[in-house]
A protein has these predicted regions:
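Right-hand nucleic-acid polymerase module
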Residues: 1-144, 154-288
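Acceptor-substrate binding/catalytic loop of class I
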Residues: 147
Length: 288
C-alpha cells in the first residue's frame, strides 16, 4: 500500500487491518515468541479480536469502531461553516519526545495535563498520538514524539492564532524548522471528517528525518521528514510502547467535547457488543 494520508474511511480500515496482520505476523513468529525481542502474552492479547471491548489502543477492531462512532457523533454536533469554522490542531513540543526505550514506560498523562492547560476554555476533542522516528536531527537515535491532535470549535481564528503563537514562543518542535503548534481551518464537514479520521488512527507509520541542503549541497540547518508504513518489527515496537493504553483514556476533551468523548466511547463499545451477539446468533443457527 502506498503511504497516503489516512483521511478516507476505506484507507483507515485497510491500514488498520494491515497493521494488525503485520503485528500478528511478528507476535506469533519466532522473534515475537522467543528471545530478547519477544512480545509479552499481555501485548499479544491486546491484538486479539476479543480485546476490542476494552478499546485497546493497538486493537484494529477497537480503532475502527471508535472512529466510526466519532464520525457519526461529531457530524451531529459540530457543523463548521466559512463563518464559523472548526480547526484541526496539532501540539508537538520537544518536551514530550522520549527515546524508544523510554517510550515503553512513558506516562502520557503528563502530555494530556499540559494540553488541557493550553486549551482551557476551548471546546475540543482530541487524542494522544505517537510518532516513532528512526532517526533525529542529532543522528541515528530512535525516538518517539508524543503529541496531541485535536478538533477545536466555537473559537475564532484570532483566538486560535493567539493560542498557536503563545505555544510556539515557549516551546520548540523536534525539527528546528517546524512549529510545536499548528492548525488547519476546517470550514466544511468533509474537511473536518478527514481530520477526525486522521486524528483517530493508531501510530501506523515510522518517520525518517533528512537534512535540507542548499544548491551547493551544504546543510541549511533545516530538515524534512518522510513517513512510511511500519515493517513488522516497527509494528511490534508500537505494540510494546502502546501496551496498556485504551483509546478513550488517550483522549482529551474540553467543554462540549467531554460529552462527545463519553458518547463516542459508549457507542463504540455498544457496537462491538452488538456485533459479537450477532456472530453468536449466526453460529448457533449454523450448528443448529
Amino acid at each position: 500500500m502506498a503511504s497516503k494520508p489516512i483521511v478516507k474511511w476505506n484507507t483507515f480500515v485497510s491500514a488498520h487491518q494491515q497493521f494488525n496482520e503485520r503485528a500478528h505476523r511478528y507476535a506469533y513468529g519466532k522473534r515475537g515468541r522467543e528471545g530478547p525481542f519477544a512480545l509479552s502474552e499481555a501485548v499479544r492479547e491486546s491484538l486479539q479480536d476479543r480485546s476490542s471491548l476494552s478499546l485497546k489502543a493497538t486493537n484494529a477492531r477497537a480503532r475502527i469502531e471508535f472512529c466510526r462512532a466519532a464520525r457519526r457523533i461529531m457530524r451531529r454536533i459540530v457543523k463548521p461553516t466559512l463563518d464559523r469554522p472548526a480547526y484541526f490542531l496539532t501540539l508537538s513540543p520537544i518536551n514530550f519526545v522520549t527515546s524508544a526505550a523510554e517510550a515503553e514506560t512513558y506516562d502520557w498523562s503528563m502530555l494530556q495535563k499540559w494540553a488541557e492547560e493550553q486549551l482551557k476554555g476551548f471546546c475540543y476533542f482530541g487524542i494522544v498520538d505517537a510518532a516513532p522516528y528512526a532517526n533525529t536531527p542529532r543522528g541515528r537515535e530512535k525516538v518517539v514524539s508524543w503529541h496531541i491532535h485535536a478538533i477545536v470549535w466555537n473559537a475564532s481564528r484570532d483566538e486560535m492564532q493567539a493560542l498557536k503563537d503563545s505555544i510556539n514562543k515557549r516551546h520548540q518542535s523536534l525539527l528546528p524548522n517546524r512549529d510545536a503548534a499548528h492548525f488547519r481551518v476546517r470550514s466544511s464537514w468533509k474537511g473536518l471528517r478527514q481530520s477526525l479520521t486522521y486524528m483517530l488512527k493508531a501510530p501506523l507509520k515510522t518517520y525518517r528525518v533528512y537534512p535540507i541542503k542548499d544548491s551547493n549541497k551544504r546543510p541549511t540547518g533545516e530538515y524534512r521528514q518522510k513517513k512510511d508504513w511500519h515493517r513488522s518489527g516497527e509494528a511490534a515496537a508500537v505494540c510494546r510502547f502502546m501496551h496498556g493504553a485504551e483509546i478513550d483514556k488517550l483522549c482529551v476533551a474540553g467543554l462540549e467535547g467531554r460529552e462527545i468523548l463519553k458518547d463516542v466511547a459508549a457507542r463504540s463499545v455498544a457496537t462491538i457488543r452488538e456485533q459479537d451477539a450477532t456472530r453468536v446468533r449466526a453460529l448457533i443457527r449454523a450448528v443448529g
